[in-house]
Amino acid sequence: MDTNKEGARHLTKCAYLFDAVLARIPEDRWDAPTCCDGWTVKDCASHAIGVMVNLRNRALGEEPVDYQDGSWAGDNPLSSCRERLDDLVEAIQGADLDMQFNSPVLGDQILGEFYGL
């Protein structure tokens, strides 16, 4: 099986699992503290949703966003996650998984392999 396709499948599975986790968070717990000093549950969700946006942007060859600005969860983190998840899945389906790009942290990467990390 093609490693790059496996990477894309892995990312898609992980994104859907993240959605399932968010779906289990009670409405009154979004402002609860987490083990990340100074971060609420909503802050952590926003960070992960922003990362999802960047993964989509990689698939489309677009510039990365500031995934740490705290805005990605919006007023309804689950709805925001689902909207971004749909965008990510759509982008992956048409992506060139063999495309090479430069990650500021990991250096030169192949998109499909990167998705499998």
What are these model-predicted stretches?
Residues M1-L117:
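Aromatic-glycine hotspot motif
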